[in-house]
UniProtKB/Swiss-Prot annotation:
Residues in compartment: Extracellular: 60-66, 126-163, 214-248, 311-339, 407-409, 511-523, 576-581
Protein's GO biological process: L-arginine import across plasma membrane; L-arginine transmembrane transport; L-ornithine transmembrane transport
Organism of derivation: Sus scrofa
Protein name: Cationic amino acid transporter 2
Alphabetically ordered keywords of this record: Amino-acid transport, Cell membrane, Glycoprotein, Membrane, Phosphoprotein, Transmembrane, Transmembrane helix, Transport
Protein localization: Cell membrane
Bilayer topology term: Multi-pass membrane protein
Amino acid sequence: MIPCRATLSFARCLIRRKVVTLDSLEDSKLCRCLSTMDLIALGVGSTLGAGVYVLAGEVAKADSGPSIVVSFLIAALASVMAGLCYAEFGARVPKTGSAYLYTYVTVGELWAFITGWNLILSYVIGTSSVARAWSGTLDELLNKQIGQFFRTYFKMNYTGLAEYPDFSAVCLILLLAGLLSFGVKESAWVNKVFTAVNILVLLFVMVAGFVKGNVANRKISEEFLKNISASAREPPSENGTSIYGAGGFMPYGFTGTLAGAATCFYAFVGFDCIATTGEEVRNPQKAIPIGIVTSLLVCFMAYFGVSAALTLMMPYYVLDEKSPLPVAFEYVGWGPAKYVVAAGSLCALSTSLLGSMFPLPRILFAMARDGLLFRFLARVSKRQSPVAATLTAGVISAVMAFLFDLKALVDMMSIGTLLAYSLVAACVLILRYQPGLSYEQPKYCPEKEALGSCASAASKSKSQVTVLPEWGFSLRAFFSPSLLPTKQSASLVSFLVGFLAFLILGLSILTTYGVHAIARLEAWSLALLVLFLVLCVAVVLTIWRQPQNQQKVAFMVPFLPFLPAFSILVNIYLMVQLSADTWIRFSIWMALGFLIYFAYGIRHSLEGNSRDEDEDEDTHSNNVHTAAEEKSAIQANDHHQRHLSLPFIFHEKTSEC
């Protein structure tokens, strides 16, 4: 019995949930000074990085052609699905932590640590790679004099290291780390200036493109493309068409447009940094959803406009993949405009760098405050900024940018981001089908009808960790759900969400690695495809039939459960597309994370310590009560440990520092 009890106790530690109360919201040590406009600027600056100056040309030439505008539309719709899930959690749980916190309060501590640990990796690599890109852009403007100097005197000939140490990237990272340590208000002001310049440059590109553009560039015939290929002595493609496609608006067909959309999806990554500002916004319940949705809309309009202008200015097949906009302006006779584009590119890289550095210390701060990482990272300065986490993040990112060649590591950013998107969407599904939520105390009391009251369970005012709610469901809940959510319906939905993720993973692997078998109509592949599709549809429809919680918050995801389910599908499919080398590196990073968690985090978890204190108090109380009172207290405490805790709905907080 003892080993079984120890195993059960260990399992409870892994799935214990964080409870966020009104008291903990008021206890924030960070400065609440950001406005809705600050969040929009932060989201736009982080998302609308240098990719807008490069990605459009690359995708248009290789995948989509003029239909790149459709690719960006599809990618934007897929990104909005993830954004809406973040927006609902931002309205429900306006605390620092983003996807890490949302996972912690919904599915438990282990998944929360995995999410936070991978977000740390994503932001570190993102910060370092953007800093090196900023340094490279500056070097291009100076005719590559900086790079030539360091190659001559500081060249590094070691596998895995950069060609030369990038002092410019280090100085930039440390400068921004100092700015972020000084205060969030000052950082937001600098971000708004750079974002405004970036938007103005992109507006100039759009206007110039529509003025100098030619609609004929979208109506290029297939015969014309074949003649060009023949004159260049380039062999035709496998289907006999030109290597530049069949011409027209979709030269590579709708499959090419979809392939372009998969690439363009990553252009919208970055809005999640808004969700880390929950304790620094004056009105988080409204500001965070508005900031996320508006920033994605602005970014889509920018990507749509720039890509449309670019494919009007010059034929898609002659676009330059590395510097499409400067080459396009030279093509139409506006060569000096490339300096305007260069200035906008530097501003875009600056805001993108700030957007990567801003959430990183806040994830470190949130995990350290909960005890899952080292406590010194939770120190706050007199200006109410997470200074220890900010400086630590800056030093780590600076070392990465200084020494390493990050090209091989960039794909690892995608794992952390896509995993976070998937978990947040799954958490929204689980959350919305839970029994009634209250503001501070246990939200579901199954003993109420039997005992007449659950006052003894609700008497404690402080937050409690929740472990091992009563799982299990009946066939009646499956085939004939009740009108209101119950413990059984909530357990059923939680199980089905996990099963749906498993089915989507299998479907993604099949359509990725068995696509040729499906194309050849092989029986086994078609049978598996039909099985996965039927089961996915059945699971989603079963979830749809379950009763939802009717409590309202400032923002709620529409079209439940279809929208979050489709978001999970998109994210898992994109994760499966990553290379085996990327997953091997990811496994090494996760092994390091599990070492830290099981050696330090699981023993220092604030939620675990709170639970131990509560158990000690209950033991002392039980020793001094009568036998009848002792029995009643044990029953109440048993319920308190079993009830399913979920995020609270907070009153709006609008006070300013």
